[in-house]
Design a protein with these regions (language model features):
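Fe-S-dependent hydro-lyases/dehydratases of central metabolism
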Residues: 98, 102, 107, 115-357
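Short inter-helical turns and helix N-cap capping residues of alpha-solenoid HEAT/ARM repeat scaffolds
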Residues: 38, 78-79, 107-111, 139-140
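Well-ordered alpha-helical segments embedded in enzymatic catalytic cores
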Residues: 29, 44, 85-86, 220-223
Length: 357
């Protein structure tokens, strides 16, 4: 399994992208290896289980959560993963198959507090909310602390605020970029594989652009965008008109692949990033909001490719070389909360949870 996986890693690295997340079958094989680790591979196996299995309600997540639950509940012993570590890892899986075991672990004298810390940052509780409430009503101290944390919105306040000032490097795409430029229809089959699909972003030659596709019609300016990151700042997608055309979450995924940051413990997905345009199409604006990005409409005429620009989101100013080059107002101050929460969707679900608690 490891040999096959490493070959796959090498093939993907040649394309400049990370490996695919592990499948349910690979995850099951990985767990067998964890039970009886080959010498020298111990750390790698734990890393793979920690960072390369999808979260949520994926088939592989089910396999991972079942095993971690068995270890956390003391039904299985694992030399490489303690009960406490297994509980922590369950807490990184967002929702779905990890919730039941974490709620059960609130009763555990040794690791109940670890389960509580995990649930405090978990928003996708749905009906399991009532199970936590019942335990709290019966006097379970861990469940009470979870309810209190949700009521105090610690899932939100524990995250950093959007800073007063952001330094960005401009990746400027002249003219109108529609969602087919960002997520081409002929490449639709790769859309679920976000890093692979992102290679097709801007794959066709554009008039007046300061970049060339690496392979016209096949591969976009991947290395060019990477070279902009070498300046050490966030790279912002900047265009005259951005995101017109059909609604495609995949278009946002591709932009965020190059401009966002990794979602911790979730393979091959990113969030955040900055997108600037004279005009940003409404549906594209919304999908950016959902993903925790900062989309701002402002005059981008004085921003050129590779410029380093200071963005002051609360003041509504963009500054280059000490001079204000554009002023703006965000569409709603809620945008700043959405960015802090990691997206509009977590903000909505989190607020609901806090209101209930």
């Amino acid at each position: 399994m490891l040999d096959n996986y490493r070959q796959h890693v090498a093939e993907r690295a040649a394309l400049g992208i990370p490996p695919l997340p592990l499948t349910a079958k690979q995850t099951a094989e990985l767990i067998e290896l964890l039970k009886n680790p080959p010498a020298g591979e111990e750390q790698n196996l734990v890393e793979l289980l920690t960072h390369r299995v999808p979260a949520g309600v994926d088939d592989a997540a089910k396999v991972k959560a079942s095993y971690l639950a068995a270890v956390a509940l003391g039904k299985e012993a694992c030399a490489l993963i303690s009960r406490a570590k297994a509980t922590e890892l369950l807490g990184t899986m967002l929702g779905g198959y990890n919730i039941g075991p974490l709620v059960e672990l609130l009763d555990d004298a040794e690791i109940g507090t670890i389960a509580a810390d995990a649930l405090k940052k978990t928003l996708l509780m749905f009906d399991a909310f009532h199970d936590v409430k019942e335990k709290a009503d019966r006097g379970n101290a861990n469940a009470k602390s979870v309810m209190q944390s949700w009521a105090d919105a610690e899932w939100f306040t524990s995250r950093p605020e959007l800073p007063e000032s952001l330094t960005i490097t401009v990746f400027k795409v002249p003219g109108e970029t529609n969602t087919d430029d960002l997520s081409p229809a002929p490449d639709a089959t790769t859309r679920p594989d976000i890093p692979m699909h992102a290679l097709a972003m801007l794959k066709n030659k554009r008039d007046g652009a300061a970049f060339e596709p690496e392979e016209d019609g096949k591969r976009g300016p991947v290395k060019f965008i990477e070279s902009l990151k070498d300046k050490g700042h966030l790279v912002a997608y900047v265009g005259d008109v951005v995101g017109t055309g059909s609604s495609r979450k995949s278009a946002t995924n591709s932009v965020l692949w190059f401009t966002g940051e990794d979602i911790p413990f979730v393979p091959n997905k990113r969030f955040g990033g900055v997108c600037l345009g004279n005009k940003i199409a409404p549906i594209f604006y919304n999908t950016m909001e959902d993903a925790g990005a900062l989309p701002i409409e402002l005059d981008v005429s004085k921003m050129e490719m590779g410029d380093v620009v200071e963005l002051r989101p609360y003041e509504g100013k963009a500054i280059k070389n000490g001079e204000v080059i554009a002023e703006f107002e965000v569409k709603s101050d809620v945008l700043f909360d959405e960015v802090r929460a990691g997206g509009r969707i977590p903000l909505i679900i989190g607020r609901g949870l806090t209101a209930k608690a």
